[in-house]
């Protein structure tokens, strides 16, 4: 199955794919899955206790990094539709975690910022992930980190 997918994506006939490369790709997929599950475990638990999910975390994270972010900018960052963003953003606003202001330059533009409670939650969520990454980086060293960063930068456009 994976080999067929690889052929569709690469245009290379299945019989020309290096099986060791195929196996390494499968191993990378599995490692990526387990790493992501571990990376999100603590935030998922915190979010679940509050009736929230990963989409809420992503919104909190990017609004926290970009105060006064407007809704269209957030849509571009997240790569979702207005419809997909509407319910989770409304919930965060209703819970008092996100504040919505009208932009001074254009009354049609809504700008988003974290409230104090939102900033506290976002810090708690992100801190657990920052610590998780820091432990892994310490174990692997700078050379491995440089390689990992290159891979992560290339994945969105691969």
Name these PLM-found stretches:
Residues 40, 90-150:
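Charged, amphipathic alpha-helical coiled-coil/dimerization segments
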Residues 1-50:
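N-terminal leader segment of winged-helix/HTH proteins
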Residues 71-72, 83, 90, 110:
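Residues within helix-turn-helix
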Residues 41-81:
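N-terminal helix-turn-helix DNA-binding core of bacterial DNA-binding proteins
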Residues 33, 61-65, 126:
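Short, locally clustered residues in the helix-turn-helix/winged-helix DNA-binding domain
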């Amino acid at each position: 199955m994976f080999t067929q997918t690889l052929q569709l994506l690469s245009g290379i006939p299945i019989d020309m794919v290096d099986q060791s490369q195929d196996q390494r790709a499968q191993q990378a997929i599995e490692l990526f899955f387990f790493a992501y599950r571990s990376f999100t475990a603590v935030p998922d638990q915190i979010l679940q206790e509050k009736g929230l999910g990963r989409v809420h975390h992503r919104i909190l994270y990017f609004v926290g990094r970009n105060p006064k972010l407007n809704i269209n900018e957030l849509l571009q960052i997240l790569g979702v539709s207005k419809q997909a963003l509407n319910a989770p953003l409304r919930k965060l606003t209703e819970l008092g975690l996100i504040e919505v202001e009208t932009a001074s330059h254009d009354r049609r533009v809504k700008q988003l910022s974290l409230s104090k409670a939102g900033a506290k939650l976002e810090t708690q969520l992100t801190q657990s992930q920052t610590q998780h990454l820091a432990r892994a980086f310490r174990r692997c060293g700078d050379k491995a980190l440089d390689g990992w960063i290159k891979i992560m930068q290339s994945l969105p456009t691969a």
